[in-house]
Swiss-Prot record:
Pfam family for this entry, one: Oxidored_q4
Listed InterPro entries: NADH_UbQ/plastoQ_OxRdtase_su3, NDAH_ubi_oxred_su3_sf
Domain of life from the UniProt record: Eukaryota
Coiled coil: none
GO function terms (MF aspect): NADH dehydrogenase (ubiquinone) activity
Gene, per the UniProt record: MT-ND3
Keyword check for Mitochondrion: yes
Disulphide bridges, residue numbers: none
Membrane topology: Multi-pass membrane protein
Primary localisation category: mitochondrion
Annotated GO CC locations: mitochondrial membrane; NADH dehydrogenase complex
Top-level EC class: translocase
Record-annotated membrane-spanning stretches: 3-23, 56-76, 85-105
Protein name listed in UniProt: NADH-ubiquinone oxidoreductase chain 3
Length: 116
């Protein structure tokens, strides 16, 4: 067995053991103090959980999608190994077209409407 395979095996085994132990130990003896929310030593006034807007989550996912698309399309002409610039332009246009179709679909379905 090569040195690299030995290192990868030991790393994977150690990571798996540590992950299992970290999930297993807290279930053995849950502490009431650690399970309660902390508010400067006082009893909590209400729930520590706040409601999360699903529309905000959808807008955030769309932002990340288009941000990633821009990050991938900007260096495309320099990093592309396609034979002609026209082929690069065609692929970039196809990606933009598919993303535009997805945006139009979200718009028609009402996913971009913030207030109801």
């Amino acid at each position: 067995m090569s040195l690299l395979m030995t290192i990868i095996t030991i790393t994977a085994l150690l990571s798996t053991i540590l992950a299992i132990v970290s999930f297993w130990l807290p279930q053995i003896s849950p502490d009431h103090e650690k399970l309660s929310p902390y508010e400067c030593g006082f009893d909590p006034m209400g729930s520590a959980r706040l409601p999360f807007s699903l529309r905000f989550f959808l807008i955030a996912i769309l932002f990340l999608l288009f941000d990633l698309e821009i990050a991938l399309l900007l260096p495309l002409p320099w990093g592309d190994q396609l034979p002609t610039p026209l082929l690069t332009f065609t692929w970039a246009t196809a990606v933009l077209f598919l993303l535009t179709l997805g945006l139009i679909y979200e718009w028609i379905q009402g996913g971009l409407e913030w207030a109801e």
